[in-house]
Amino acid sequence: MLDQLDAQSPDALLALIKMHAQDPREDKIDLGVGVYRTNDGATPVFRAIKAAEQKLVDTQDSKSYLGPEGDTGFVDALKPYIFGKDAAMGGRLEGMQTPGGTGAVRLAVALSKAAGVQRVYLGTPSWPNHAQILEDVGVETGTFRHAAPDGTADIDALLDVIANARASDAVLLHGCCHNPTGVDYTPEQWDRIADALADSGVLPILDVAYHGLGLGLEEDVAGVRKVLAKVPEALVAYSCDKNFGLYRDRVGAFYMIAKSADDLPAITSNANALARANWSMPPDHGGAAVRTVLRDDALTATWLDELAEMRERMRRVRERLAAADNDVPGLN
């Protein structure tokens, strides 16, 4: 039976990793996979994470199962950074740990389908795996143009989709640092998006993959919070890959905002059932390290400093790259 399988094309984005490693040129630059690198090409472990891992070595006394919801302490520790310090949401918010942001997006789409969503709208271009996940889960994919030719977000295209969507539709939006265009919605545009979603009843799925690496921790989720303040229900996928440097440890979180607190038990039980069937429980180590950082004031301060250093360095590198492009004929 297995000999009947057709070969699949390799993931174009991941293939760039191998191509970059095999390229002998010393002046090569990897602009493919979203991994932070220093000037010498290294992807270092955060100092705060190293210290947290050592604390875990010294204090962790069990490797027993936690269940499909994962480390709830990790999930709760992230909440103030994503939703705000006073974001109780009237008991309408619940979350669970996932294997990376990809696991969170997959769970969001699968849960949406279980709830009756038949079509998910996705801006183009987008992170390639978004479309693959939608196809694999088995929902219809609708599209709209994300970036206009002038380099700004095509807000009218999104608003038109929301206005004409069916009651059983959802829309998947990048919370910040749009991948791959880098074109984000302005605060005023987020206001319009939030109002449109509230009026339409379309379910928002918000993917937050680069929190803290755009303008700042608060600024990067301002749009997400605007939406959540207006809509009755939403799903949020969150990744710790970039802002904690935990790429291969697969650390993510999935949050469900229900219409009422009474709806949460059924929603979370369905999410847990889907997680159980897909990965049983998420890997613990990375989430435990993040929880340890966020529960220790000194480690949190170190992490915030490291994140700010990364953000500022990337800003400088982008400016230098843009300036260099201006000097190359044919690129403007």
Language-model segments: what does each one mean?
Residues 1-4:
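Generic N-terminal amphipathic, Lys/Arg-enriched alpha-helix
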Residues 9-100:
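N-terminal small-domain helix-loop-helix segment of the aminotransferase-like
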Residues 37-41, 180-181, 213, 245-246:
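Short catalytic/ligand-binding loop motif for oxyanion handling, primarily in non-cytosolic enzymes
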Residues 60-197, 212-213, 222:
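Conserved core of the PLP fold type I
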Residues 302-332:
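Conserved PLP-binding catalytic core of the aspartate aminotransferase-like
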